């Protein structure tokens, strides 16, 4: 596991117990943006999070991060508590199951029908297989995608 993955896992271990219903921890990212290191914690709730929610969550999470010993952060960082946005990542099977009926973007480790990217409506997620309806030029098609082939999945905005 590389240093960034280790930091993300340490943060997840201490932050997950602090984030309680109705909030849900969606994702954690740590990386450089410009010259600054940013720790982004993506949180959501059913009706969406507000600016006040992010402020309250920051006050809860920041002191907890200071308890991690030894300090895993090699340099100073900015803490960002944010919404996952319209293109929310689908990082778990539960998240994918919750996206049935929605328009999603899926990247694959290995091509299916000579395609490694599909964007369309998730019709079903059963027995570790996604069933998606997508447009191939002007025709609607359906594809079955084994979950094990999914490298990245997220909600998508249909234009």
Swiss-Prot record:
Q: Which organism is it from?
A: Streptococcus pneumoniae (strain CGSP14)
Asked if DNA-binding is a keyword of the record, the answer is: no
Q: What does this protein do?
A: Required for maturation of 30S ribosomal subunits.
State any GO CC term: cytosol
**Which keywords appear in this protein's UniProt record, sorted alphabetically?**
Cytoplasm, Ribosome biogenesis
Q: Which family does it belong to?
A: Belongs to the RimP family.
State the name under which the record lists this protein: Ribosome maturation factor RimP
Gene encoding the protein: rimP
Task: List the Pfam families hit by this protein, alphabetically.
Answer: DUF150_C, RimP_N
Asked whether the keyword Cytoplasm is assigned, the reply is yes
Subcellular locations according to the entry: Cytoplasm
InterPro entries recorded for this chain? Ribosome_maturation_RimP, RimP_C, RimP_C_sf, RimP_N, RimP_N_sf
One GO BP: translation
Question: Chief location of this protein?
Answer: cytoplasm
């Amino acid at each position: 596991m590389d240093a960034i993955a280790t930091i993300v896992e340490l943060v997840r271990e201490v932050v997950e117990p602090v984030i309680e219903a109705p909030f849900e921890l969606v994702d954690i990212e740590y990386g450089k943006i410009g010259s600054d290191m940013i720790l982004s914690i993506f949180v959501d709730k059913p009706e969406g999070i507000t600016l006040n929610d992010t402020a309250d969550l920051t006050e809860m999470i920041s002191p907890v991060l200071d308890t991690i010993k030894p300090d895993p952060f090699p340099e100073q960082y900015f803490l960002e508590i944010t919404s996952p946005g319209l293109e929310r990542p689908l990082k778990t099977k539960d998240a994918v199951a919750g996206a049935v009926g929605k328009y999603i973007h899926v990247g694959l480790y290995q091509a299916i029908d000579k395609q490694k990217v599909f964007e369309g409506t998730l019709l079903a997620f059963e027995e570790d297989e996604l069933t998606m309806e997508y447009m191939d030029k002007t025709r609607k098609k359906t594809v079955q995608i084994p979950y094990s082939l999914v490298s990245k999945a997220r909600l998508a905005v249909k234009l």
